[in-house]
Regions:
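N-terminal Sec-pathway targeting helices
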Residues: 1-11
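Short, surface-exposed patches at the edges or C-terminal ends of soluble domains, predominantly
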Residues: 12-312
Length: 312
């Protein structure tokens, strides 16, 4: 079993992984202006959660996405409050990205039982949810909420030795029309041929399954694997803290997914098993996310929002 060092910081224990991850630099040259906005006046209200130790916020890791959503005509608001039926009133799309539990190893739920009930009831009544998760520890923190929609999150680390970006390695997964892993759905079709999504790149993440009727628009191949998370622990020495986890041997992940879309009562749900696909990051490894040339991650993000807001 291999050991992963998640974080080393001089700060409060519960925030260690969060603080390291949220400050990822974004690509300031990324084009966030939308040439053909879905809404030209007062668009639907999008509520973005920033109250559950979220690793990507609208001012840091997901700022390019937030700016693009605004340019597309949506009214984007953020919240740091617990979710209630009253708070969700008037909201069209709820966006939950990389929430974390209070436990430093993140094997605790990010959302309380009352919050998951409020969110599920709101979606059933016609709301739309975008739930963005990732590999450990984010899969475990979101698992209880995902289960309310009959979505099973592995919480592990996905790889594909066959369908991946050659220059990046097996953890950079390629979904395309050509390899048959980018499945037909309004999200991949768009409103016109110009909006059609043909190639998507993800960056490790985890695998998932959905209920009958859910569409796995990012389908994992028969060669894909998922390394399950194992025991995690916190080591402290002086003011330093490390969160370590041992993960198991690769397990078959063929037929599972990294992107699922479904109807839930009167509402709609999209669950993503990887968060980097909707970032626009520039760091020492190069470009990551919507700014990757040769891939349609940018259009995928717009199409997801269009489908959730029923513009598509």
């Amino acid at each position: 079993m291999r050991k992963i060092v998640i974080a080393v910081v001089v700060i409060a224990a519960a925030a260690s992984f969060f603080l390291l991850k949220r400050d990822r630099p974004y690509d300031r040259s990324f084009e966030t202006r939308v040439a053909n906005p879905a809404y030209r006046d007062s668009g639907p209200v999008v509520l973005y959660d920033e109250g559950h130790r979220n690793a990507h916020t609208t001012s840091a890791g997901y700022k390019p996405l937030a700016d693009m959503i605004r340019s597309d005509g949506y009214i984007l608001r953020t919240t740091s409050q617990p979710f209630t039926a009253q708070q969700l009133g008037g909201v069209s799309v709820l966006v939950l990205v990389l929430a974390q539990g209070a436990n430093p190893t993140n094997d605790s739920a990010a959302y309380s039982d009352s919050e998951t009930s409020a969110i599920a009831d709101w979606v059933r009544g016609g709301g739309s949810l975008l739930l963005v998760t990732d590999h450990w520890p984010f899969g475990l923190a979101a698992r209880s909420l995902a289960r309310r929609f009959d979505v099973d999150l592995s919480g592990g680390f996905a790889e594909d030795p066959k369908y991946h970006e050659p220059d990046r390695g097996e953890s950079h997964l390629v979904f395309s029309e050509e390899n048959g892993l980018l499945r037909e759905h309004p999200i991949t079709r768009g409103r016109s041929d110009a909006e059609r999504v043909r190639r998507v790149l993800t960056f490790t993440g985890q695998s998932m399954t959905g209920p009958p009727g859910a569409v796995p628009f990012l389908l994992l191949s028969d060669s894909a694997t998922d390394r399950p998370p194992g025991p995690a622990r916190v080591e402290r020495e002086g003011g330093n803290e490390r969160v370590l986890m041992e993960y198991g041997d690769p397990q078959p992940a063929g037929g599972r997914a990294q992107g699922i879309a479904m109807e839930f009562g009167g509402g709609r749900v999209v669950v993503l098993g990887e968060a980097g696909m909707l970032r626009a990051q520039r760091d020492r490894t190069g470009l990551v996310g919507m700014n990757m040339p040769g891939y349609d991650n940018r259009q995928l993000a717009l199409n997801i929002m269009h489908w959730l807001s029923r513009a598509l």
